[in-house]
Amino acid sequence: MIKLLEWLGDPLGMLESSSDMVAYAETLRTKSVHKSITGILITADYTVCRDVLKSPNWRTRPEANNIFEKLYLGSIADSEKIDPFLESIIAKDGDEHSRIRKLIQPAFTFRVMQNWRMSAERIAKELVNQIESQSEIDFVASLANPLPLAMICEILGVPLADRETFTSWGRTLAIIGLDLPRTTKENQELEKASDELTNYIAHLLAERKRSPREDLLSILANVESEGDTLTDREIIATASFLLIAGFETTVNLLSVGTWVLLENRDQLKQITMNHDLVPNLVEEALRVVSPVQYTARTAGSDLELADGTNVRRGQTIVLVLAGANRDPAIFDNPNEFQLRRENARKHVAFGYGAHHCIGAQLARLEAEMLWRELLLRFPDVESWKHAGTPMWRPGKTIKGLDSMPIHLGKKK
């Protein structure tokens, strides 16, 4: 069916056939909003994307209203099993979303973030310290994967012996679960990984209730607001989705962000002369990389978009975030990587409004700590070079690298 849509030149078919979301987004610049023959709307317009993301009239949980949408969005069935995608805060709207966000907020306070910052700094130092001078490494395997993995496992209190298995579940859920449409085999893999992950976290949660520790599960198990608490299902779904979203997207921010730096050597030289630019690097990398390439929302009522497009209740819109983050109406010379871009933080890489990613600050500090440590220990950036061909990961929703061999030069 998707092949037919592609043959017809339908924007949804073109989306599914595209391997480059930035190039695809450029084909959408002819107007703010395009409509597929399936009824699905598609946009790469920054203003439309931002307005949809912040509006309470749009729901995060999609609806399959016809055979075309069912093929693309997937069928949604209620189950006794815990679904990390449909039961976490990311899929909640309105009062339900506000309630859960209020309850999990104690897990993301300034004090907690400061502790996480110290952990990220310590882990980044340990990882960079393991790299030998004048050696070649796979940046993904040596740095981009281990840092967020260690951080999330530490935050959740996952024992060292279980971390590889734990992460494999998260990667399966992120790579397959965030891409649609899926094959029958992919759905089976997804269900297996989801069951194993949620069962494992349920076991950890039961342990934390018996013996609380200084970790996220213990905090979530004991939060209370006006007599309200989180259910076990909500805690398990929240922790599961933190792994899915917090691990894979951060890996890709780190790896693809470093790839972008290597492709923009003038910017790399600037940052080695002024490490105060590292926070700017994080924001511009988020804008250019857009780890989550696109997302979708479903209208909760009949409404009108910023460009005047009329939308019926239940209609779905695909928001091409990779395109919104390069909208020339917002960002001057949007395809250029500029460390000193003044409005880089306007990006929508972490969403916008009520559904702005609650773990955004964690991803930012992980990236900042790793890049700072690399610049300190390997200051000769002239020696930073590709040592082989980067291998890009298949999949459209999440942009990332499977491997990236690099040479970092002499170690200080």
Residue ranges and their predicted role:
Residues 1-412:
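Cytochrome P450
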